[in-house]
A protein has these predicted regions:
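Transmembrane helix-loop-helix hairpins in multi-pass inner-membrane proteins
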Residues: 1-47, 52, 103-216, 297-389
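A short amphipathic helical element positioned immediately N-terminal to and/or at the very start
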Residues: 48-56, 125, 225-238
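Membrane-interface interhelical connector segments
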Residues: 201-237
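Membrane-embedded helical hairpins/re-entrant loop segments and their flanking transmembrane helices
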Residues: 75-102, 264-279
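Hydrophobic alpha-helical transmembrane segments
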Residues: 24-28, 62-66, 93-98, 175-180, ...
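Transmembrane alpha-helix interface/packing and boundary motifs in multi-pass membrane proteins
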Residues: 102-112, 265-267, 281-301
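Transmembrane helical segments that form the transport core of multi-pass membrane transport proteins
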Residues: 230-286, 291
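Hydrophobic/aromatic residues in alpha-helical transmembrane segments
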Residues: 36, 75-83, 121, 257-264, ...
């Protein structure tokens, strides 16, 4: 019989990201942005309708792009299972798929910067019985391992392009500036990893009065968890035997996404240097953080188009290539994500009826790799733990 985990996530119907009003608002915004980017703007700049050249695409290269997309989704699921599932909470591959694909739909339909997917994943893991603190710590590690490739790619390609090691436009604004900003962000992440887990206690000791100490301790919880998650991420990198699948999943996810874009350019008979594809891809994806566009719809399209035009790629090729990329990488998986959301609701109900994943027995101890290359002291087997909030 499964133990009860207090406040394990609430009912699926209470998820704020899935409401009829939000869906209608999102549909209107998405439609307006897509019409503006792919119909109105090309006409204003004298390029005609961006859809006119879609019929010229080579079907073989479109098939290659779809294959890369399947690889991207598979590696994304593997990344999540390696960081969040496994011995931490023995999720099956099907359960991991449902959480990830449902989160993908939430991210792409209801929020910018991935927040919708984070909310849904947090809910699902809490429904599965994982303690709140552990969910937060592992979600930080999952996101950090996934997005660390942003600054790394911008730095690497920026330096290679600027120094002429690889072919492509080497202007400062497309190479040095992005690399410098990425370097600062990477440095900030490394410094945050140094935040000690007891930072709240240390800072509270400096505050005056019980109320002030309580406020300081509560505020410090978030950076403390971020620090723990980042150190966990570093441990995965430094322990290939434990973190190999996670690192491979994150690497494969971004490599496959870049592969989709590369294949769509090939579909229109245009050769774009690989370093330019990577740099333009990540520069465009920064627009995903644009707050008014759901999952960067319209903003990412415009960002990628602008980046490649600045790199000297002909506008009449950039528009259809980016459009096809977004159709394959963004819109094609969406129906699967919506179906996975409803499957996940049924799975969450089954967990409550048949037992929580967090209660499932495991054959190994929950040893967590640390950044110094050592394994943390083993805890009790998961199935033997007492309920925790």
């Amino acid at each position: 019989m499964s133990r009860e985990v207090p406040a394990n996530g609430g009912d699926a119907a209470d998820l704020p990201i899935f409401t009829r009003r939000r869906a209608i608002q999102t549909a209107i915004v998405v439609f307006a942005l897509l019409v503006g980017i792919y119909f109105l703007f090309p006409k204003l700049v004298g390029l005609g309708n961006a859809l006119d050249r879609l019929g010229e695409a080579n079907p073989l290269w479109i098939a290659v792009a779809i294959g890369f997309n399947a690889l991207a989704l598979g590696t994304y699921v593997a990344l999540f299972k390696a960081v969040v599932g496994g011995e931490a909470m023995p999720l099956s591959w099907r359960e991991t798929y449902e959480i990830n694909m449902a989160g993908l739909a939430a991210t792409r339909l209801f929020s910018a910067g991935g927040a919708g997917g984070i909310v849904l994943s947090f809910w699902a893991l809490r429904k599965g019985g994982m303690p709140r603190h552990e969910v937060a710590r592992r979600m930080v590690a999952f996101l950090a391992l996934q997005y660390v490739f942003y600054p790394v790619a911008l730095i690497a390609c920026g330096v290679l392009l600027r120094t002429g090691v690889v072919s492509g436009k080497d202007s400062v604004e497309l190479t040095v500036v992005p690399a410098a900003v990425a370097g600062l962000l990477l440095l900030a992440g490394l410094l945050m990893a140094l935040i000690p887990p007891d930072v709240g206690r240390r800072l509270a000791a400096l505050a005056r009065g019980e109320r002030s100490r309580a406020v300081v301790a509560n505020v410090a919880k978030a950076p403390a968890i971020v620090g723990e998650g980042l150190r966990f991420t570093a441990g995965l990198f430094l322990n290939p035997s434990r973190g190999g699948l996670a690192v491979l999943g994150a690497t494969g996810f971004w490599a496959a996404n870049v592969g989709i874009l590369w294949a769509t350019f090939k579909a229109f008979g245009v050769h774009v240097p690989l370093a330019v594809v990577v740099q333009g891809f990540f520069l465009g994806m920064v627009a995903n953080l644009f707050p008014l566009a759901p999952a960067g719809v319209g903003a990412v399209d415009a960002g990628m188009i602008g980046a490649f035009v600045l790199f000297g790629i002909p506008e009449e090729t950039v528009f259809p290539a980016v459009l096809v990329y977004r159709l394959v990488a963004f819109w094609m998986p969406l129906p699967f994500g919506v179906v996975a959301f409803f499957q996940l609701r049924q799975t969450a109900q089954r967990w409550e009826d048949e037992g929580l994943p967090f209660d499932r027995p495991v054959t190994i101890k929950n040893e967590v790799p640390t950044a110094d290359g050592k394994k943390a002291a083993p805890e009790a087997p998961i199935s033997a733990r007492r309920p925790r909030k």
